[in-house]
């Protein structure tokens, strides 16, 4: 069995390791605004950005992507208050890699998973980062995990 860089195997589940890249930049940016509010003695800015910083960090910490090979499903938890979404492998359609550039500089790369639900195609985000290569490596590892179990 291959060792995975982005996943940790626990029983029949493959749990994606936390990826702080893009989310941590957002949290640090909001923390900078909160600190700027301290220097300018603006309590509204301190409270607003302080609370947003904490909420965003908790949201990043709660994000999960699990591949359960016993139940043959993806389990995706995004956001602070959303319930985990369970997607059977049989409903999986494909992955989408979205790359956002500003003036030839890549600012965000996100990996989305498309699946069928009630005869409609739905989309759910899996991961975000700064490089296409890291997202492609993640796709390759997911394919290695689900490929032996007859994805098609």
Regions found by a protein language model. Give the residues of each.
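Membrane-embedded alpha-helical segments of small multi-pass membrane proteins
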Residues: 35, 51, 55-58
């Amino acid at each position: 069995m291959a060792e995975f860089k982005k996943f940790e195997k626990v029983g029949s589940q493959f749990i994606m390791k936390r990826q702080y890249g893009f989310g941590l930049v957002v949290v640090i940016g909001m923390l900078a605004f909160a600190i700027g509010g301290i220097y300018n003695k603006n309590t509204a800015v301190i409270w607003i950005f302080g609370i947003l910083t904490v909420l965003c960090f908790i949201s990043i910490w709660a994000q999960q992507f699990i591949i359960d090979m016993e139940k043959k499903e993806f389990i995706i938890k995004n956001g602070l208050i959303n319930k985990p979404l369970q997607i059977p492998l049989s409903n999986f359609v494909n992955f989408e890699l979205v790359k956002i550039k500003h003036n030839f500089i890549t600012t965000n790369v996100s990996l989305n998973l498309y699946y069928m639900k009630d005869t409609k195609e739905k989309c759910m985000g899996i991961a975000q980062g700064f490089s296409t290569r890291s997202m492609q490596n993640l796709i390759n590892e997911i394919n290695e995990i689900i490929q032996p179990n007859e994805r098609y």
